[in-house]
Amino acid sequence: MAQDIIDGINPTRMELLSLKNRTKLAVKGHGLLKEKRDALIKEFFDILDRVKGVREAAERSLKEANEALLEAQIAMGDLAVRKASLSVKESIDVDIKSRSVMGVSVPVTNVKMEERSIIDRGYSFSDTTIQLDEAAKKFEESIKFLIELGEVEKTIFLLAEEIEATKRRVNALEHIMIPRFENTEKYIDMRLQEMERENFVRLKMIRSTIEKKDNEAKEAAIEEEAAEVEA
């Protein structure tokens, strides 16, 4: 099977030198991309462990919050709990920034939410129970875990995308570009050697022709001198 080479390449020494430089850059880039891929994969699995921990904490917190809510509904009644929830004041401030992981911008969240009193929450002290207070506290704690879970899951998604893109670039260089450059180098080198051999044969033929003509001229001159002597 014919080897893959760069189309339309000119088999010249300048082209060969340029191609060798391109091959060196491709090999260097391949090495750097492999390092980036490996670092991203390590970061991915480090954060994946964190995802598992945060998800478990969020699920546990939500379970406790729902259990507390159920106790509040039993103590107060479902309608009273709904009425109290409508008067709750929203007070969640999430600061979202970013950090770079091997060139990938991933989110960093900071939840600014202090523990609130009954007055801060906005519902009536006289119409509610301690069970509702506990449920509200549990759900507020759950929100922090859910926001953190969103942060780490988004980070995992972005890293996974970049890992796949980096893998594609590594494979393209390793299996397509670098072999194509190397095959083209071999092709140019082979053609240059062929042209050198052709030039050598051509020069040898020219030299032989010149020598033959010189010999013929010398022989003709000798014959002419001999004829003049005889005359």
From Swiss-Prot:
Cell compartments where the protein resides: Cell membrane
GO molecular function, one term: proton-transporting ATPase activity, rotational mechanism
Membrane-topology descriptor: Peripheral membrane protein
Key words, A-Z: ATP synthesis, Cell membrane, Hydrogen ion transport, Ion transport, Membrane, Transport
InterPro entries named among the record's database cross-references: V_ATPase_D (IPR002699)
Record Pfam families: ATP-synt_D
Entry superkingdom: Archaea
GO cellular component: plasma membrane
Any one Gene Ontology BP term: proton motive force-driven plasma membrane ATP synthesis
The protein's role, per its UniProt record: Component of the A-type ATP synthase that produces ATP from ADP in the presence of a proton gradient across the membrane.
Binding partners and assembly: Has multiple subunits with at least A(3), B(3), C, D, E, F, H, I and proteolipid K(x).
Family that this chain belongs to: Belongs to the V-ATPase D subunit family.
Protein's UniProt name: A-type ATP synthase subunit D
Source organism of this protein record: Methanobrevibacter smithii (strain ATCC 35061 / DSM 861 / OCM 144 / PS)
Gene name of the record: atpD
